[in-house]
Amino acid sequence: MDTCVETFFNPYLRRKPRRDWRRCEDNNKNFLQVVPRGVLYDGATGLIKVQSGMEPRMFYAEKEYVLNPDKPWPTLRTRGWCRGPYSDDVRFHTYDQVVNLVLADSDEQISPRWNSHVVPAGNVIRMFGATDEGVSVCVNVFGQKAYFYCERMQSEDLKNTVYDIADKVPEPCSPFSVSISPVTKSSFYGYGLGHIPNLYRLSFNNWNMCRKIGKRMLEEGRKVYELGVDPLARFLIDRKIPSFGWCLARRYSVRAAGYVSRAQLEIDCDVADILPIEEQSNWPFYRCLSFDIECMSGTGAFPAAENVDDIIIQISCVCFGVGEMVHHAYDVHADLSTPAVPENHLFTIGPCAPIPDVKIYTFPSEYEMLRGFFIFLSWYSPEFITGYNINGFDIKYILTRAEKLYKMDVGQFTKLRRGGRMFVFSPEKGKAGFGTSNTVKVFWSGTVVLDMYPVCTAKASSPNYKLDTMAEIYLKKKKDDLSYKEIPVQFSAGDEGRAPGGKYCLQDAVLVRELFEMLAFHFEAAAIARLARIPLRKVIFDGQQIRIYTCLLEECSGRDMILPNMPSLGHGAAAAIEEAAAGGEGDETSEGENSNNSRTVGYQGATVLEPECGFHHVPVCVFDFASLYPSIIMSNNLCYSTLLVEGSPEVPEKDVLRVEIGDQCHRFVRENVHRSLLAELLVRWLTQRKLVREAMKQCTNEMQRMIMDKQQLALKVTCNAFYGFTGVAAGMLPCLPIAASITKIGRDMLLATAGHIEDRCNRPDFLRTVLGLPPEAIDPEALRVKIIYGDTDSVFAAFYGIDKEALLKAVGALAANVTNALFKEPVRLEFEKMFVSLMMICKKRYIGKVHGSQNLSMKGVDLVRRTACGFVKAVVSDVLHMVFNDETVSEGTMKLSRMTFDDLKKNGIPCEFGPVVSRLCRARDDLHLKKVPVPELTLSSVLSQELSCYKQKNLPHLAVIRRLAARKEELPAVGDRVEYVLTLPDGCKKNVPNYEIAEDPRHVVEAKLSINAEKYYEQVVKAVTNTLMPVFPRDMPKREKFFSLVVPQRIYIPDQFLHLCGNVNELARGGDDSDGGDSEKENMDTERSSSHEAMET
C-alpha cells in the first residue's frame, strides 16, 4: 500500500437502515398551559393546567402578537440579508466554529461545486463571525478531513482492517470514505529514535467514524498517533487559521437558498480558500445577552425543573454589545451614530405594572413565555450569553422545562436553522473526557456561553461567591433584598406585585452585565483561544491540557513530528505528580492516607524546608523565582524530544543531564545535541509577552490596551501550564520523567539558594561590600540570618540585627547576587516582599504584615469558619490587629513564642501579651452581661437536602426547622441558609449538645430568651487559639488549653441570686459600720448588670 487510496464504506449495506436523526419541528397545535392561579385571581395559590388549542401568543405595549418564529420580534431591529453578489474577497472576524456531519442525502441545498465533499458524507466546518461593518457571517467550509496515524503490521491490508473494524464499532454508524497514504514522521517522544517504520495516515471525511475506528484500533493494541484531534483542530492548525481573529474568504459562493444559519451573510467555500489575517487584533461589534430566571415551587421546596408544578415565572434579559462600533443593533428606533445603551427586557407570566426603562412582554402561560424567550433569542442572535450560575441552574432549568415538559425543539432557535444544538453536559465525577475538565459544560451552536460564577470563583478570594458578595467586591454595589419566599407572594399579588419581582429578577442580569464588563474575561479567553488555536468555548470549559496539546501539535506539524497517544500513568505516579503540580510534597501525605503511592515511583515534591513555626517580629524577606518551571525547562533543555529512552542512540556523558531521584535516573540530552521543543516555545512566547508589554506602554487606545493586556496574560498563563501538562496523570500527554525532573531541579535550586543566603548574609563584610549596607545598619552582636521556610518557588529569610529600612534597599542586590552565583539564564531570583511581622503556622499557612501595608497577608488561613457568627469574627480580628499592629503586643507575642512550658509556669505570660488576654475577658463579660446583640450571635447552616434525607438528625439547623414546624411558622426551602442562636433554657447542663439549645433568632428576640454565653465564649477561645497556636510554648501539652490556664476565672451570678450578694459582703466585712456598707452597696449597684453579677477569683 504505497499510494493514497480513497474508498467508500456504507454501513447500511450490511446493517439495518439508519434512523432519521433529524428532530421534528415544534409545530404542535395543542400545548399544555400551566398558569399560576394568582395571575387570574389576586392572592390565590396553586396552578391551573389546561390543554390549549389556540396559537401561542404574547402581549407587548397593549398589543397582541402570535408567537411565530418567522415573524420579527416587535422591539428588535430586523437585520437585512446580504445575499450578494460579492465580487471581492470577504474579510471577516470569527469567534466560534462548529463541525457538522453532512450526508449525501441531506436536504441541505449544497451547490454542485461543493457537493463532492459530502459524498457519501463529509465534515463541514461552520465559522461564525462578523465583518468590519458588523454584518453577521456564517462561512461553510467544505473538504476538511479528520485523520490520525498508525503503524501498519507486516503483510497487512490496512484498508480491509479499517472496514473490518468499522463493522464492529458501536452504533450509531454512518457512511464514510477513507484515504490511506504512507508518511515519513518521527515521534515527539524520545530522543533520536528516527522515522517511525510502516507509518500511514488514515484520512476520513466522517469525523464520528474516524474517532470510533481509531479508538478501536488503540484498544486492540495498535500503535496509534494523534487520535482524538478533530477536523476543526486540523483546520485551524494546518491552515494557521485563528480560532478568534480575522480571516479572508476567497473563491466562495453566496448561498441563494437552503440557508443553514441565521447570519446576514452565508457563504460556502473550500478549505483551501480560507486565509488568516494575523496582524489585526481588534474586535468587530458582537451582541451580548445577560439573563436570569425566577422560579416558583409548587411545594415550597427548592424548585426542581422535572416537577411540573415548579414553573418559571419570569425571565430578565439585558442586551448589550462588546467590541468596536457598538451601536443600537437591537433597537428598532436606534440612532446608529450613537454608542449603544444596554436594553432591559422582562418576560413574565401575567400582566405586570410598568417598570422604568424596561420592555415588558406578558404571556398567558409558561410554555408561551419560554417559546417567546427562544424566539427573542433567535432574532436577537447574541454571540455571547452570560449570567450567574447559568451553567449549573438557569440554562439547565429552561432546557429541561422546554424539552422534557413541552417537547420543544430548542436547537432551531440557535444560530443554525438546521443541525443546531443546545444542551448542558454534567460529567460524572472523575469521568471527564480526554483532555477535558470536570466542569459543567454548555454547548450552544454559534453562541459562546460565559457564566460569570466560575469566573468569579477563580479570580476572587471570598467567604462566599453569591452575586451580592461579588457585586460588593467588584462594583461596590448591593442587591435590593427580596426573600425567595416573598417572590411567590409578590407574584400572586397582581400587576403591582409582579413589578417588584421583575425588578429583583432584572437587577441580577444588570449586575452580571456590569461584572462581565468589569472583569473582561471574554478578552482574556479570546487571547488564549487565539494563542492555542482552540475554540473559545474550549478555553472556557476544557481546562489547560487542550491548550498545550494543540500548541505542541502545531509545533510538531512543521517539523515532521507526531504526538503519540500516551497511556495514563499508574495510581502511584498519578498521586505523586498531581501533588507536585499543586505545589505539595510528594513524600508526605495527610493523616489516614496511603503514603506509599509517591514513594513507589521515587517522586519527591517541591516543599524543601520545614517551616520554623512561631511569631517572627523581625524583617522576613521573601524571595521567589520568576516563572520557575518554565525557566527550569529552558535552562535544562527538558523536553519529550530530549529524553533518552530505550532505543535512543548513545550520547557522551558530558552532553547528558542526569536527574537522580531516589533509585531512578532520568537523562536528557543537552542543548548542543538537540534543542528542546518545549524550550523553544517558551522562549518565543516569553519574548512575545515582553514585546506586548512594551507596546502597552506606548498604546493610548483603551480598548487596544485592554486587548494587549489580556494577550500578555494569556501568554503568561499558558507558559506556566507546561509543568502541569506533563504532570497530570490522566492528561493528554503525561510524562513522569519530565515532571519529576522539574520538581527535583526546583528543589535543588531552593536548597542552594537557602545555603547561599545563610552562608553569605551572616558575614558582615559581605553585607557591607556586596550589598552596600552601611555599618550603622548592622548590629554585629545580634546579626543572624536564617531561612525559616522554603516552599515550591519561594524562600523566607529572617534577618536579625539589620535595620529593616536599609535592608529593604539591599534585598534586590542580594537576589541578583544569588542569581549570578548559582544559576544560568533564564533563571532569575527576585525579591517579592518583606514581612515586618510573620506568624508561621505550618506548611503553606501563614499570616504576616507586609512592609508598607496596613493589611495582613494570609495564605492557607481561614481565620474562622464561614458559619461562625459575627461576634467571633470581630474578636479574632481585634486580636490579630493587636498582635500585628501594636508594637508592644508584637514584642510580647514574640517573647511568648520563645518560652518553654516551664518558663510559662514559673513566670506566667509576658506582660506585653496581656491585652490579648484582656480582650478575651471583655468578650466573656460582653456575652454574660448581655451586651452582644442577637444578630451578632447568629449562626447559620445550609439546608442542602430535604429534612428526611439527612442521616444525622441531631444537627442544630435541623432542630430549628423542627421547632419552627411545631410552632406552625414558615419553613425554609432546600438551598436556604437556616439561621440559629444557642440559648440557655432553665436547667441547662454545661455540655448540652448544640441541637438541643438551637433556636430561631426571631423567636429568641420575641420571647426574650437567654443566650448561652459559655457556648459562645468557647467558640471565641477556640477561634483565637487556632489562630495563635504557633506562638504558644511548643513543649506545652494540650496547647489548645492555653487560654484556660492564663485567662482569670470569673463567676457570673444569675439574677435570682443577686439579693444574696449584700449579705455575703456584710459577712466578709465582719460587721463594719453602715457607712461602709452603704458605700459597698453603692459600688455593687454601679457594677451590677440587669441580669448577672461578675465576681473574679
Swiss-Prot record:
Reactions catalysed according to its record: DNA(n) + a 2'-deoxyribonucleoside 5'-triphosphate = DNA(n+1) + diphosphate
GO molecular function terms listed in the Swiss-Prot or TrEMBL record: DNA binding; DNA-directed DNA polymerase activity; nucleotide binding
The species this protein was found in: Murid herpesvirus 1 (strain Smith) (MuHV-1)
Protein localization: Host nucleus
Membrane-spanning segments: none
A biological process term (GO) from this entry: viral DNA genome replication
Protein's UniProt name: DNA polymerase catalytic subunit
Biased composition (Basic and acidic residues): 1078-1097
Gene (UniProt): UL54
InterPro entries for this protein: DNA-dir_DNA_pol_B (IPR006172), DNA-dir_DNA_pol_B_CS (IPR017964), DNA-dir_DNA_pol_B_exonuc (IPR006133), DNA-dir_DNA_pol_B_multi_dom (IPR006134), DNA/RNA_pol_sf (IPR043502), DNA_pol_B_thumb (IPR042087), DNA_pol_palm_dom_sf (IPR023211), DNA_pol_type-B (IPR050240)
Gene Ontology CC terms: host cell nucleus
